[in-house]
């Protein structure tokens, strides 16, 4: 769709000198979302990625110029270049951009420019960001507020991870992995929790990570709002340093928005939220696990503070379809040994894996859990090795894939073979290492039993592998 010159630049009128915006790594979830919003706003968008996929195809159909592979000629005509944190310094497009003195900015800097003219709600934290962002977006949509949202994963009910709305609201996932969330200046900031992760960014110093989160919260104006989980002792330690209005949520007695009487029936949650004015709200949540009740209560708290009515909040949570790759049920399949259910989940930190297993246990009763686990990054495997050993020992059967490197060089003792050895030595489960994923289906058929829940777990290619498995099992 062509846009007139007058229709262009409604969000950021000061960017009138910008004609074409080029994204290096445009296929990434966060990058594609921002590209889609700017494309819909009328900017010329180009971008490159190492592989074609659903996201790049959708952007191309919407009018973006997409290149597969990286080459310096791809930046021709660009007024500004946006880079993903995954892009290396020797990328030919990045090198050429600097040589031609084209401004190069991080993804979060472009998001900050879009947020500058909006009522921004930024969601940060080690776990739960994507789901919480999706929940807030769906509540505001249900309330007919038509928000713009940019999420790090698919918002299933919207069928996309980004949407350009007509209202002043912008709801966005804030990325702490490279500390780029410090560029954002929202009106409301959510912090779901904090644990050591991406420690290379913080020089291995958790205190530095905590200080960075405080800086992020200090980006709020004095009339802004910080929403923090009362169940997280690290966050509660930081509250006195925030210097802004803080509201808390959680199961804790001290929480401003307090969760009581949580029960899980199948893969749904039921609970009551006690509000600061002692109002009691009974919630039906269409996704499982106490961790999702926390995510939903953060969203509820923001909505209540904004004055959104209970009906819109409750309808959005009862109808919530989840975020992409968050306990994503791929279907039930008949195999030689019986019927099994296959679930794909993005969790790749020990805490995330643990809450996924817990939610599956509560929803699946006494059935066995068979996990296909793909470690994500050698550095994370090294830093959290003992935690991975403990949490992966909680399943009934474990298939281990090779580490998904995400561009990292191998680290001795932080590979899948070492992980398998330590898990086996713990004596609770005997993992099977599958390096050739073409053999995965055959290995599964040898070990699965009638009624098993198969969890494909990790942030790398395991999702594509599990979806390929689901397709082959349909035939």
Swiss-Prot record:
Major location category of this protein: cytoplasm
Catalytic activity: UDP-N-acetyl-alpha-D-muramate + L-alanine + ATP = UDP-N-acetyl-alpha-D-muramoyl-L-alanine + ADP + phosphate + H(+)
Function per UniProt: Cell wall formation.
Protein's organism: Haemophilus influenzae (strain PittEE)
InterPro entries in UniProt: Mur-like_cat_sf, Mur_ligase_C, Mur_ligase_C_dom_sf, Mur_ligase_cen, Mur_ligase_N, MurCDEF_pg_biosynth, UDP-N-AcMur_Ala_ligase_MurC
One of the GO BP terms on file: cell wall organization
GO CC annotation: cytoplasm
Pathway(s) served: Cell wall biogenesis; peptidoglycan biosynthesis
Record has tRNA processing as a keyword: no
Listed SUPFAM superfamilies: MurCD N-terminal domain (SSF51984), MurD-like peptide ligases, catalytic domain (SSF53623), MurD-like peptide ligases, peptide-binding domain (SSF53244)
Annotated ATP binding sites: 125-131
GO MF term set: ATP binding; UDP-N-acetylmuramate-L-alanine ligase activity
Keyword Membrane: no
Protein name in UniProt: UDP-N-acetylmuramate--L-alanine ligase
Gene3D superfamilies named among the record's database cross-references: Mur ligase, C-terminal domain, Mur-like, catalytic domain, NAD(P)-binding Rossmann-like Domain
Top-level taxon of origin: Bacteria
Keywords, ordered alphabetically: ATP-binding, Cell cycle, Cell division, Cell shape, Cell wall biogenesis/degradation, Cytoplasm, Ligase, Nucleotide-binding, Peptidoglycan synthesis
Subcellular location: Cytoplasm
EC number: 6.3.2.8
